From Swiss-Prot:
<dbReference type="InterPro" id="IPR043133">
    <property type="entry name" value="GTP-CH-I_C/QueF"/>
</dbReference>
<dbReference type="InterPro" id="IPR029139">
    <property type="entry name" value="QueF_N"/>
</dbReference>
<dbReference type="InterPro" id="IPR016428">
    <property type="entry name" value="QueF_type2"/>
</dbReference>
<comment type="function">
    <text>Catalyzes the NADPH-dependent reduction of 7-cyano-7-deazaguanine (preQ0) to 7-aminomethyl-7-deazaguanine (preQ1).</text>
</comment>
<comment type="similarity">
    <text>Belongs to the GTP cyclohydrolase I family. QueF type 2 subfamily.</text>
</comment>
<keyword id="KW-0560">Oxidoreductase</keyword>
<dbReference type="Pfam" id="PF14819">
    <property type="entry name" value="QueF_N"/>
</dbReference>
<feature type="active site" description="Thioimide intermediate">
    <location>
        <position position="184"/>
    </location>
</feature>
<feature type="binding site">
    <location>
        <begin position="85"/>
        <end position="86"/>
    </location>
    <ligand>
        <name>NADPH</name>
    </ligand>
</feature>
<feature type="binding site">
    <location>
        <begin position="223"/>
        <end position="224"/>
    </location>
    <ligand>
        <name>substrate</name>
    </ligand>
</feature>
<keyword id="KW-0963">Cytoplasm</keyword>
<dbReference type="Pfam" id="PF14489">
    <property type="entry name" value="QueF"/>
</dbReference>
<comment type="pathway">
    <text>tRNA modification; tRNA-queuosine biosynthesis.</text>
</comment>
<feature type="active site" description="Proton donor">
    <location>
        <position position="191"/>
    </location>
</feature>
<dbReference type="GO" id="GO:0008616">
    <property type="term" value="P:queuosine biosynthetic process"/>
</dbReference>
<feature type="binding site">
    <location>
        <begin position="83"/>
        <end position="85"/>
    </location>
    <ligand>
        <name>substrate</name>
    </ligand>
</feature>
<dbReference type="GO" id="GO:0033739">
    <property type="term" value="F:preQ1 synthase activity"/>
</dbReference>
Length: 276
């Protein structure tokens, strides 16, 4: 467990405060988890963003009438801190009985508070339900590898030694799996996700990739660090010209988390998947 997470509200009984309380936000420094992967803020081998989508955003108009909306938050992958997820939820709930004179004021408030917690500018987009309905459900790019026949015997920790490639071939492809699962390092609750790998490099053996993804099944770590670990393991193996790893996790408490790490300019489709 990250030492800072021990002091967060995650896994503890919490009072739900319904009036604006920005002090509820609990930042967790990324540095300790980067260090586990041999990284520092100055040596990150990727660009990236963590997309958080909130489906339970509500506030009051000055008249007292409630408003509901969906919010998208984009937290830079090189921000000094992540925001602990339960504290994020408690903070958003604190808007429920607070009056704002419009969505623009809500957006500005969210940007100010979340940027202060993350230590870097956080993008905020507030959307109405009709926009989301019109977008529909996204389909991940590339080939789904979930029907491949594999034998699995260990689930306790990621096993990069399972990964195989043919370095006599250089190819460009996208593959994805819906079998990503890990556990919250604080509560041990399951985190269910889908993951996309897009790259140009040595030809990756798809069955070995699937076995590797499944090896995360009982691993305890935050969403962001799971994706960073996958990125680094594939980068070491493939030595790719370009590489993107993008995971979309099932929501919990009205929030889903979607980390994106890439060697390329960010080009992210943040539409929800069928399980989101």
């Amino acid at each position: 467990m990250h030492p800072a997470a021990e002091h967060s509200p995650l896994g503890k009984s919490s009072e739900y405060i319904a009036t604006y309380t920005p002090s509820l936000l609990f930042p967790i420094p990324r540095a300790a988890k980067w260090a586990e992967l041999g990284l520092t803020a100055q040596t990150l081998p990727y660009k990236g963003v963590d997309f958080w989508n909130c489906y339970e955003l509500s506030w009051l108009l000055p008249s007292g009438k409630p408003v509901v909306a969906i919010a998208e938050f984009s937290i830079p992958a090189d921000s000094p801190n992540i925001i602990e997820s339960k504290s994020f939820k408690l903070y958003l709930n604190s808007l429920n009985q607070t009056a704002f004179d419009g969505a623009a004021r809500v957006q500005a408030t969210l940007e100010k508070d979340l940027s202060a917690a993350a230590g870097k500018l956080v993008g905020v987009r507030i959307r109405n339900l009709a926009e989301i309905e019109e977008e529909g459900v996204a389909v991940l790019p590339g080939v789904c590898i979930d029907e491949l026949d594999i034998t699995v015997s260990s689930y306790d920790q990621p096993q990069p030694e399972l990964l195989r490639c043919d370095d006599s071939q250089v190819i460009e492809e996208a593959v994805h799996s819906h079998l990503l699962k890990s556990n919250c390092p604080v509560t041990s609750q399951p985190d269910w996700g889908s993951v996309v790998v897009e790259y140009r490099g040595a030809a990756l053996d798809h069955a070995s990739l699937l076995a590797y993804i499944v090896s995360f099944r009982q691993h305890s770590d935050f969403h962001e660090q799971c994706v960073e670990r996958i990125f680094l393991d594939l980068q070491r193996l493939l030595k790719p010209e370009k590489l993107t790893v993008y995971a979309r996790y099932v929501r919990r408490g009205g929030l889903d988390i979607n980390p994106y790490r890439s060697t390329e300019v960010l080009d992210v489709d943040n539409r929800r998947l069928a399980r989101q």
